[in-house]
Amino acid sequence: MRPIFPFTSIVGQERMKRALVLNAVDPRIGGVLIRGERGTAKSTAARAMAALLPQIEVFVDSPFNDDPHSPNTWSDWVKEQVACGKQLEIRKQQIRFVDLPVSATEDRVVGTLDIEKAIQKGERHFEPGVLAAANRGLLYIDEVNLLDDHVVDILLDSAAMGVNIVEREGISFAHPARFILVGTMNPEEGDLRPQLLDRFALSVEIHGIRDARERVLIMQRNLSFESDPEGFRMEWMPPEQDLSRQIEQARTIVDEVTYTNRDLVSIASLTASLNVDGHRADLVILKTARAHAAFEGRYSINERDIALAAELSLPHRIRRSPFQQAEVTMEDLQERIEQLQGATASQSEPEQVQKQEGASEKKKQ
């Protein structure tokens, strides 16, 4: 196994690192597309993120990396084993980094059902694909713009639904497919269709660092890593462990992060004022804002969370706006949000929105 360059030692590219971290906190955000020239640490950052994440518990013989503590997400295979009274052993493993080749076919991605065996022996046999291996891990697609559009659609559907269902000749098989989706591409080699571009929750455009001092630092760290990979990794172990713990803690509280009606109005007003098509962006901003609040250890979102989420969620979704001439900044978005909130402040007082609406209604009664 080749040594992995530490995530926290990557110089600059803060937006890219932030987008990866927030997807690690909550994979339900829906992945990140990283666009940039060659040699800007795109694949390095993705591999480093997978290595950074804490170990997970899985069933020993399951090819689907099922979570032993989440029965409602178990694959059909685990359900069948449990129904037969089998005791499945549990072990810990490092989160998997799954690299999808550009030549991947639909069957290679989703897996295949053996129809002949089902007809002859009455047995349901499923050969797992890439989505099975990537469950609860990180799925990396280099040059995603060169991948078959239909395959990209399948991947994005699975990332959004969190489950892969394969159906052939009246036979079906389902397994969890919740993963951190990271796609990278060089825009010079062609872009994604707008329909597919919108399906990536977050998008970051990165460039080579122009500051001479930072370029020197990049050279120094890369040379140190090449000469002594293990020593370099040990040097960066403390910040790596700190970030890993912070992500793990954020994962435990992200579902408890609350938001107000005013926050929802701010998000909706922002996307409407920027002529964003559809409603996917609104939901992505909310999920990303909650993940950022959880990452900072807070239980409610604020204007900065929304602005930061919008900075990562909107640039690739806006067709006609100043964002096409100048790079969007979090400060610009936060200022716009404050203006929108000021315009709507007199209309209604913010009311706390709890995830458990039914429970909230009971409390009001």
Task: Give the residues covered by each predicted segment.
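Short flexible/disordered coil segments
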Residues: 109, 182, 244, 339-345
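Basic, amphipathic alpha-helical bundle interface domains used for macromolecular binding and assembly
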Residues: 151-152, 210-318
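Short, flexible loop/turn segments with low-complexity composition
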Residues: 63, 231-236, 323-324
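C-terminal engagement/docking regions of AAA+ P-loop ATPases
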Residues: 41, 268-280, 291-365
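Short alpha-helix boundary/capping motifs
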Residues: 44, 48-52, 62, 74, ...
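Short leucine-rich amphipathic alpha-helices used at interfaces
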Residues: 123, 129, 173, 234, ...
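Short, intrinsically disordered/low-complexity patches at protein termini
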Residues: 41, 57-58, 66-70, 189-190, ...
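Conserved ASCE/P-loop NTPase catalytic core
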Residues: 1-213
